[in-house]
Amino acid sequence: MMAAGAAVALALWLLLPAVGVGEAGPPPIQDGEFTFLLPAGRKQCFYQSAPANASLETEYQVIGGAGLDVDFTLESPQGVLLVSESRKADGVHTVEPTEAGDYRLCFDNSFSTISEKLVFFELIFDSFQDEEEVEGWAEAVEPEEMLDVKMEDIKESIETMRTRLERSIQMLTLLRAFEARDRNLQEDNLERVNFWSAANVAVLLLVAVLQVCTLKRFFHDKCPVPT
């Protein structure tokens, strides 16, 4: 029980944004990704804190398990159902603008009584830069007329680079999830091919033995030969 509680606490710590000790204001925006095993006949929900007037993108994929499908729902902090999907292998949904509070994401495998599912999902927030921090940084430098390159150009270049790097990380994460799903599917297909190949070989051997026995009976004379 202690190990299970520690695992749940670690999962929540990885998913929920960290709140600074002794700091005021809303929690900082953080992207998150998580992979978990959803047992057969079970439903599992996660909660993600979000600030107001932001953009939240949710992507999920079923990367393992028979059928590669799951039911998905997304609820707002007020309990309003925003997204409801049934028996889907993947999905991408965007909430814009967001409400301040905890969004609820649920994955349901109740329709499956045997097969468990391996589910990957990712939460992506649009990054917003603190205007006061930007203004303070700009005031700390020399006047723009004394610089060869304007501060706005530098900030724009840095912001563009940061956005592209974040998007590259997100795309690599999704590609890794696709690769895991394809690998699991290929391994399942390999097991099926090996099983049915062995079954066919066994049937062929059985048929060959039966044919030999049948032919031997045709040539076996049961009548005694008089001497």
From Swiss-Prot:
Entry-linked InterPro entries: Emp24-like (IPR015720), GOLD_dom (IPR009038), GOLD_dom_sf (IPR036598)
GOLD domain sequence ranges: 43-125
Lineage of source species: Eukaryota, Metazoa, Chordata, Craniata, Vertebrata
GO BP terms in the entry: endoplasmic reticulum to Golgi vesicle-mediated transport; Golgi organization; intracellular protein transport
Record key words, sorted: Cell membrane, Coiled coil, Endoplasmic reticulum, Golgi apparatus, Membrane, Protein transport, Signal, Transmembrane, Transmembrane helix, Transport
Protein name according to UniProt: Transmembrane emp24 domain-containing protein 1
Extracellular face residues: 25-194
Signal peptide: 1-23
SUPFAM superfamilies to which the protein is assigned, alphabetical: Supernatant protein factor (SPF), C-terminal domain
SMART domains in UniProt: EMP24_GP25L (SM01190)
Principal location class: membrane
Subunit organization: Homodimer in endoplasmic reticulum, endoplasmic reticulum-Golgi intermediate compartment and cis-Golgi network. Interacts with IL1RL1. Interacts with RNF26; this interaction is important to modulate innate immune signaling through the cGAS-STING pathway.
Gene: Tmed1
Motif COPII vesicle coat-binding: positions: 218-219
Bilayer topology annotation: Single-pass type I membrane protein
